[in-house]
């Protein structure tokens, strides 16, 4: 399961999406997330699915790789769907057993929430798959730079977020390595119920924390040896600049959000 977690991984390429400015991809992802919560009809969700499919296709990412990012959180998606199915109020009861009942409204709401989570994760995965950590840091820093006037440390925040994102696959690889080493010594992580498996994971914590601190120290030494002193006075080999493809991407995602907003509230405004 650990090998199936793809958060923080970068897939090199030269597609339309890879060549976009990182600021464009970050803002487009945020706008798409807003658009997800504007959707309220099957047609709107169909448009969102089609748009996500188009972006994945244009990015030339392996479809299996993109959907692999969903595997570790399928249980969360399923639990979210079930909770909404059983707790949402409704009149048309589809299933009833003792105190539990599933209504048509609950089934629809649960399906909507599950689809929203899937779309959110898929689109966010495209951002990390098509943007290297260094470029992502530059993009976040540029977006946060206007807030420096109120004391926001733009460069430091961007660096921390990127290092944290990059450390996720590193720590997962380390966890997998420790599990294999302990399995070779007779440890069993696959048998037993959920509680027993969780208890079997406890011996992993100490070596994992030790490894994490060691890697953090190695990273700090490497940055210091390269004379890293923060963002002040730093220059870059490649300066970020918006191009025609960035404006095209902005126009597409803004049209998507505006169109979904019009579908949701347009009829109400016309009635007024």
Name each model feature, range by range.
Residues 41, 45, 60-64, 88-96, ...:
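Transmembrane helix-loop junctions in multipass membrane proteins, especially transporters and channels
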Residues 14, 37, 60-65, 97, ...:
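Membrane-helix interfacial "entry" motifs
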Residues 1-44, 48-57, 142-145, 149-152, ...:
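Transmembrane alpha-helix interface motif
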